[in-house]
Amino acid sequence: MLITISPAKTLDYTSPLATTRYTQPELLDYSSQLIDVCKKLTPAQIASLMSISDKLADLNAGRFSEWHPDFTPENARQALLAFKGDVYTGLAAEDFSEDDFDFAQQHLRMLSGLYGVLRPLDLMRPYRLEMGTKLENKAGKDLYSFWGDTITEKLNQALREQGDDVLVNLASDEYFKAVKPKKLNARLIKPVFLDEKNGKFKVISFYAKKARGLMSRFIIQNRLTQPEQLKAFNLDGYFFEAADSSADELVFKRHEQ
């Protein structure tokens, strides 16, 4: 099984590393093309394009200008350990064993506006460029046009290398929109996480994001290989709800905390 997740806006480049091993991102030629576009933007244009504060715009203008594709452990960090949003709180890769990292490297992929597809141990320089950003480029008006079929082709390669045709989509809609399902050589499975509030079950964004990370952790640490095994997911009080599920959409619920 191959797992896809979204990146995070919050980054951590200071806490101790759980592993010293690293790999290089495979789509850096594409990243360099995007950086060339971003380097031409003023901080004011970045603030407007990304709907961020002037302070954040200045930070990211600096990141764009300093970016170069020569990644080392001194100027970059493994992607799985650099991202720090809700998904990554659930994943908690900071306590992974080397065997966990091995399994994750084969079976987990992070989708990225700048890097396209990242493996867990791929080094990454800090950036902010969300997939939904309407950044005009030579291929079109946004990043979806820029990436085209490239992300899908990279996922197909990863599917072949890890040995089956099942993709568990734990990424957000914004990011998975960069994937072309009809060109993906895989059966797509989408877990959905519902939390109870006032007696009704619904998707609550903060909890759902963390649950996507928890599910990723569950697959990695239990070395799951079959879709049927996903139904055993029970971290943090979630349980599988067969009545609301279909073959390719697995619904998990959790009672009010």
Curated annotation (Swiss-Prot):
InterPro entries for this protein: YaaA
One GO term describing the cellular component: cytosol
Taxonomic superkingdom: Bacteria
GO BP of this protein: response to hydroperoxide
Pfam families documented for this protein: H2O2_YaaD
PANTHER family in alphabetical order: PEROXIDE STRESS RESISTANCE PROTEIN YAAA, PEROXIDE STRESS RESPONSE PROTEIN YAAA
Family per record: Belongs to the UPF0246 family.
Protein name in UniProt: UPF0246 protein PC1_3665
Species this chain originates from: Pectobacterium carotovorum subsp. carotovorum (strain PC1)
